[in-house]
């Protein structure tokens, strides 16, 4: 889409003016007068007729008079000799109560066809340093999600960071949306959803779903969509962080920060790295990969009185978990949730791989001995089931020893019990969503491990909430079978 014609801006002494001397897609070179070179990461503005200014961000100084900037908007229609105004500061985006319930772009402009934001809305720079180490609150309080498999095997911490790893189509976005519901329902906190490289269709669907369910009243949506320049996708996590930091520091609110998909942030950085002429590193990624990821992740932390809990989805290219981008992101995480294509194909949702997923919080000193014992026994049962799959496929369960048959019986029931209907999928499945407390999850797994459900039909444990619900389902099935027999 072509932008309106450029109107050359008039120079003034308060705002140094520069002239565009080169445009290479999302990279723009600007020349200023001697002694007026803008600082790194400061914002530049190009005035357009009848529209918001095009925002550039200074990336490097080429010589004493020239800067190289990254465009945060489309540069279509931009030309040499156009005048640019230096703002003298980093991009500042709107924050506070006025943005709650709204969808914003990387520059903080509403994109939901709603009213304009108030003129006096507070603003905050997208670039800031992490809180001083002595002010950080290293909390180990558990963030209960109501999702059985997460609370049992990969507990999340208030103020911690968790990542959901998975390829395309395994349920990352659906699980993310369910966690937004959990934050609004259980903690009366604020959720900030960041769509990094999201498809426009997905963003529209999420906004519609949130409006329909009322969750939008407790959420802020910030999008850098797939069709936008790499600069927008590269900086949109910082816009979301600025909003989250305001609610944490100024209003002392708990914030759930969700990023879908942080891998697209890395991809955008890789695109810009090529446009900036840098030599690529392994697998074509930018040589500054670890630094860029660290700059985002280290700002996600908690201070006394308020927590920012971050959950990020990570696309795994070709399901290769050794990919440099995946490993760079994983090093910052407290909990790693791995979504399995095999489990998704079998209909087990959420398709969380209980053997590949992990959490540093699954420790007796944090969650208690009983929780750790049950989680370990569940993992052992599921690991044994996996190791026996080939034997079962060739010879059948009947050829196993009695101990292995018992283990397989209980492991299959555990698999089904850890599945769960979600609130966000109600309109597709027709099945009401379930949120299960940690106590009910532990009690249900304990009963299955003790053999209480050995004579139940496996289907009775599939897509239920608590064990009591499964018990009722089993009783109904038995009555129906008895009636059919008569």
UniProtKB/Swiss-Prot annotation:
Organism encoding this protein: Gluconobacter oxydans (strain 621H)
Reactions the enzyme catalyzes: ATP + H2O + 4 H(+)(in) = ADP + phosphate + 5 H(+)(out)
Assembly and interaction partners: F-type ATPases have 2 components, CF(1) - the catalytic core - and CF(0) - the membrane proton channel. CF(1) has five subunits: alpha(3), beta(3), gamma(1), delta(1), epsilon(1). CF(0) has three main subunits: a(1), b(2) and c(9-12). The alpha and beta chains form an alternating ring which encloses part of the gamma chain. CF(1) is attached to CF(0) by a central stalk formed by the gamma and epsilon chains, while a peripheral stalk is formed by the delta and b chains.
Pfam families attached to this UniProt entry: ATP-synt_ab, ATP-synt_ab_N, ATP-synt_VA_C
Gene Ontology molecular function, alphabetical: ATP binding; ATP hydrolysis activity; proton-transporting ATP synthase activity, rotational mechanism
EC class (word): translocase
Keyword line: ATP synthesis, ATP-binding, Cell inner membrane, Cell membrane, CF(1), Hydrogen ion transport, Ion transport, Membrane, Nucleotide-binding, Translocase, Transport
Subcellular location, principal: membrane
Protein name (Swiss-Prot/TrEMBL): ATP synthase subunit beta 2
InterPro entries, A to Z: AAA+_ATPase, ATP-synt_VA_C, ATP_synth_F1_bsu, ATPase_a/bsu_AS, ATPase_alpha/beta_chains, ATPase_F1/V1/A1_a/bsu_N, ATPase_F1/V1/A1_a/bsu_N_sf, ATPase_F1/V1/A1_a/bsu_nucl-bd
PROSITE patterns: ATPASE_ALPHA_BETA
């Amino acid at each position: 889409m072509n932008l309106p014609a450029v109107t050359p801006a008039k120079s003034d002494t308060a705002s140094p003016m520069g002239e565009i001397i080169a445009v290479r897609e999302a990279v723009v070179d600007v020349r200023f007068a001697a002694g007026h070179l803008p600082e790194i990461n400061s914002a530049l503005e190009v005035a357009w007729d009848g529209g918001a200014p095009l925002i550039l961000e200074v990336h490097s100084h080429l010589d004493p008079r020239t800067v190289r900037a990254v465009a945060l908007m489309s540069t279509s229609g931009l030309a040499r000799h156009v005048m640019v105004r230096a703002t003298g500061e980093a991009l500042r985006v709107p924050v506070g109560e006025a943005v709650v319930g709204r969808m914003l772009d990387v520059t903080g402009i509403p994109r939901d066809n709603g009213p304009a934001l108030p003129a006096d809305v507070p603003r905050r720079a997208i670039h800031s340093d992490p809180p001083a180490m002595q002010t950080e609150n290293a909390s180990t309080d558990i963030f209960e999600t109501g999702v059985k498999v997460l609370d049992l095997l990969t507990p999340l911490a208030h103020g911690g960071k968790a990542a959901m790893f998975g390829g395309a189509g395994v349920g990352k976005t659906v699980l993310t949306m369910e966690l937004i519901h959990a934050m609004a329902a259980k903690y009366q906190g604020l959720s900030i959803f960041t769509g990094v490289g999201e498809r426009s269709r997905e963003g529209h669907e999420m906004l519609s779903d949130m409006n329909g369910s009322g969750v939008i009243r407790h959420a802020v949506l910030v999008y850098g969509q797939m069709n936008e320049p790499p600069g927008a996708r590269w900086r949109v996590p910082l816009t979301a962080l600025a909003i989250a930091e305001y609610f944490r520091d100024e209003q002392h609110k708990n914030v759930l920060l969700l990023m879908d998909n942080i891998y697209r942030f890395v991809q955008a950085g890789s695109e810009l790295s090529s446009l900036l002429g840098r030599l690529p590193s392994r697998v074509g990624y930018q040589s500054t990969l670890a630094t860029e990821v660290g700059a985002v992740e280290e700002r996600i932390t908690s201070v006394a009185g308020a927590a920012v809990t971050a959950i990020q989805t990570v696309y795994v290219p070709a399901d290769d978990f050794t990919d440099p981008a995946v490993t760079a992101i994983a090093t910052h995480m407290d909990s790693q949730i791995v979504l399995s294509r095999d489990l998704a194909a079998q209909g087990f949702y959420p398709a969380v791989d209980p053997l590949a997923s992990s959490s540093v919080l699954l420790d007796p000193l944090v969650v208690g001995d009983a929780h750790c014992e049950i989680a370990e026994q569940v993992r052992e049962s599921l690991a044994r089931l996996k190791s026996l799959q080939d034997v079962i496929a060739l010879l059948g369960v009947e050829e196993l020893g009695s101990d292995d048959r018992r283990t397989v019986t209980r492991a299959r029931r555990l698999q089904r019990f850890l599945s769960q209907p979600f609130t966000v999928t109600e309109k597709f499945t027709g099945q009401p969503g379930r949120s299960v407390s940690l106590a009910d999850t532990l009690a249900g797994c304990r009963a299955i491990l003790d053999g209480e459900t050995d004579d139940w039909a496996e289907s009775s444990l599939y897509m239920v909430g608590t064990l009591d619900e499964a018990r009722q389902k089993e009783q109904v099935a038995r009555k129906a079978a008895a009636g059919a027999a008569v």
